Amino acid sequence: MGHFTFIGLCLLAMFLSLSGAECYTCPIDWLPKNGLCYKVFSKHKTWFDAEMYCRKFKPGCHLASLHSNADAVEFSEYISDYLTGQGHVWIGLRDTKKKYIWEWTDRSRTDFLPWRKKQPDHFNNNEFCVEIVNFTGYLQWNDDNCAALRPFLCQCKY
């Protein structure tokens, strides 16, 4: 009797733990995180072309938004694993009004901005899109010309 009780309790615990788990499946080679799927692409595109490339996967896909230092650390490791020496990486943040008002393409809140020292600067009044900088270990951000060609990080909800 004790053996069956133990098995029953184990099955109940397994069921309860699984019922609270997120139910989404990312495509192969995409990183699952917080109910979204992320993928870094080594193709070099302008910021706008990268955003359009992300959107082609399905409605709701965009260049990635990052909201915490924990996110930044995890993505820096992910990007470093896939890109070696390929430069900075576009993310979904830009200054559409050109007044230092930074907005995510997915319209999520702008609550985390780990800028490099003396950034953003809108250098030559020509830098309004945001990249993760490779020589900071992909941990800090810089504003750059949106026409620059960069690898990029997409996010999708699957």
From Swiss-Prot:
Disulfide bonds join 26-37, 54-154, 61-156, 129-146. GO terms for cellular component: extracellular region. InterPro entries: C-type_lectin-like, C-type_lectin-like/link_sf, C-type_lectin/snaclec_domain, C-type_lectin_CS, CTDL_fold. Residues 1-21 form the signal peptide. The keyword Glycoprotein applies. Residues 33-155 form the C-type lectin domain. GO terms for molecular function: carbohydrate binding; metal ion binding. It holds the Pfam family Lectin_C. Ca(2+) binds at residues 119, 121, 127, 142-143. It is found in: Secreted. A motif (Galactose-binding) lies at residues 119-121. This is C-type lectin BfL-1.
